[in-house]
Structure formats: structure tokens, C-alpha cells
Amino acid sequence: MPLTLSHQQTDGDAVIALDGELDLASAPDLAELAGELVRNGAGNIIVDAQRLSFCDSSGLRILVSIANDLRPVGGRVSIVNPQPVVLRVLELTGLDRTVMIDWDPPQAG
């Protein structure tokens, strides 16, 4: 299933909603969008993973890269509402200790 990205940005926060599979084919799209949002002033990026059905190592690498890009400006990446299969991957790889995992509805601003 291809990945669909949507986003909104308010003040210092941006929400990126992911729908589908984050994998080798789609990870560059997320990287490009996140890079654009950071260049446009996003200090924090909230990834709405409610509809993310799969994430492979390419997707994980992009999430770590986004977190590293935000660190110098004091920002962070939060992943909200991950599906159990995605949460398990985050836990197995230790990424749940690098990014914040939350269960609240995402809001920019």
C-alpha cells in the first residue's frame, strides 16, 4: 500500500499524518516533507501514525534523521497513535527511547 502524507504547520509545530506503509519506496517522501517543514521553522514534528500500517528500517532511519535535525534547535519528534505492529517495531529497535510516543490526538500549535 503506498504512503499518503498530509501535513499542517502552525507556529513552531508541524503535524505529519501518515497513511499506508513507510518503507524504502516512501521514506524519501517523508524525508523531503520533514526537511521542508524544518526549513520553514517547525521546531517540533508530530507524526500521526494512526493509519500507518507498516514501517521498515528505511522509515525508522528517516524518523531518527528528523529527530537529529531538530535536536540543535531544541525540537523533538513525537509519534502519536501508532498501530500495535508499528509500536512493536519502535520498541524492538529502541526508537521509543529516542522519540516520544503519545496516544493523544495530534495538534499543531
Summary of predicted features, one role per range:
Residues M1-F54, V64-G109:
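STAS-like cytosolic regulatory interaction modules
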